[in-house]
Amino acid sequence: MGHFYFVRHGQTVWNVENKICGATDSPLTEHGRQQAAETGKNIVESGIKADEILYSPLSRAADTAKIISEMSGIPCREEPRLIEQNFGKWESTPRDGKGFKTAKESFACRYEGGESMLQLAQRIYNLLDEIKQESDHKTYILVAHNGISRMIQSYFTDMTNEEFAAFGVKNCSITK
């Protein structure tokens, strides 16, 4: 099997405001753009060789991926299945709001106006299965979102519900 690296998008306006982004687009801040450039530089300096960067269609991930691609010379393309989970009516609300915390407790239930954790798992697991079948020798950098990072980690690692809920990556960090 090939290798995967995961990069979460750079800082966004809603990250700063502690709001739930989900499938709603929130642009990168200037700091987020700087983070993306630094990540591209780190990829080059650390000797990471990848065949392709796949990125979420949301601008925060697309812009991050394109900046990394410019810095590293690695070609990139949009992958629609990497879009963040749709949190429905909870999008743009405070991340630490009581209602959202309660709604998150049921993995099987769909967020009102959004998608369930199971729907997200199916989408991401199918993508990873497809990529694995395409080539055993390619290396990919996936640029997406915190919720997607959690789902990718659960694909490769046996995680308890508590470990899954607690897992997260910082903006523009590189995870293998």
Residue ranges of model-derived segments:
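Active-site-proximal alpha-helix that buttresses catalytic centers in soluble enzyme cores
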Residues: 2, 7, 11-74, 115
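Short, glycine/charged-enriched secondary-structure capping and boundary segments
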Residues: 19-22, 67-70, 91-94, 155-159
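Short beta-strand scaffold positions
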Residues: 55-56, 122, 143-144
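Alpha-helical elements of Rossmann-like donor-binding domains used by nucleotide-donor carbohydrate transfer enzymes
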Residues: 38, 42, 63, 67, ...
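Generic enzyme active-site microenvironment
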Residues: 7, 79, 143
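Active-site-adjacent alpha-helix immediately C-terminal to a catalytic or transition-state-stabilizing loop
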Residues: 62, 125-176
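Phosphate-handling substructures
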Residues: 70-125
